[in-house]
């Protein structure tokens, strides 16, 4: 019976955490003057360059703008994070 009450109770802050992360993302995009179109163009360029060296899973590719803390002063700064699934390495002769 107790599990039934848990089911209908609040989600222990999960929604709050998601909302906070979304707000952070909106603020980063606003502060860096970065539009969704810019991120899409950046993604296309990254795909072009990386595709010369590896075969990638473009569907699983994720690029986002976030914040990180600098090592030397712990100040938050914008960071470009790319998750690029690699299918296989390409053979290249030099």
UniProtKB/Swiss-Prot annotation:
Domain of life: Bacteria
Single Gene Ontology BP annotation: cell division
Keyword Mitochondrion in annotation: no
InterPro entries tied to this protein: MinE, MinE_sf
Keywords: Cell cycle, Cell division
Similarity section: Belongs to the MinE family.
Reported function: Prevents the cell division inhibition by proteins MinC and MinD at internal division sites while permitting inhibition at polar sites. This ensures cell division at the proper site by restricting the formation of a division septum at the midpoint of the long axis of the cell.
Protein name: Cell division topological specificity factor
Organism lineage: Bacteria, Bacillati, Bacillota, Clostridia, Peptostreptococcales
């Amino acid at each position: 019976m107790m599990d039934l009450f848990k089911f209908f109770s609040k989600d222990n802050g999960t929604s709050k955490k998601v909302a906070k992360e979304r707000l952070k993302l909106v603020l980063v995009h606003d502060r860096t003057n970065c539009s969704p179109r810019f991120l899409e163009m950046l993604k296309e360029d990254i795909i072009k360059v990386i595709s010369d060296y590896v075969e990638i899973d473009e569907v699983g590719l994720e690029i986002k703008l976030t914040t990180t803390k600098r090592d030397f002063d712990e100040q938050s700064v914008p960071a470009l994070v790319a998750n690029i699934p690699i299918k296989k390495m390409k053979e290249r002769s030099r």
